[in-house]
């Protein structure tokens, strides 16, 4: 059976619990049509680049699916009917990635906290270069230095 990565966006005003219920319902649709869902990832609420149906944010969820095309068509049909789902994207892939997806890794990297102070290194200051006023002025270009053609 073909492998798919499926991402859907749920409205910002639904709770994370309701998104889990949606995910469970969509898994049931896939399994009822002879497929299986390998991995699910909830990426959380993220800001959208542009508004979709008056929503500025959305819950993002990824499903790794192993199912026939008919199951995917039924899943997408169910999601188009559901008012809580804003957008869907299904991609056919050669193989599923092992481990967390790039979005989940990015979120983990962002959760590592502040960098802290500079310790004994002190303030960066001017780094020994001085200000602009310390630099010598550039010579003004002359007519000869433009490389223009001479008039005959």
Curated annotation (Swiss-Prot):
Role summary: Binds together with bS18 to 16S ribosomal RNA.
Keyword Nucleus listed: no
GO biological process, one term: translation
Top-level division of the source organism's lineage: Bacteria
Official protein name in the record: Small ribosomal subunit protein bS6
Molecular function GO labels: small ribosomal subunit rRNA binding; structural constituent of ribosome
Region (Disordered): 96-152
Keywords on record: Ribonucleoprotein, Ribosomal protein, RNA-binding, rRNA-binding
InterPro entries referenced in this protein's UniProt entry, alphabetically: Ribosomal_bS6, Ribosomal_bS6_sf, Ribosomal_S6_plastid/chlpt, Transl_elong_EF1B/ribsomal_bS6
NCBIfam families (alphabetical): S6
Pfam families reported for this sequence: Ribosomal_S6
GO cellular component: cytosolic small ribosomal subunit
Family: Belongs to the bacterial ribosomal protein bS6 family.
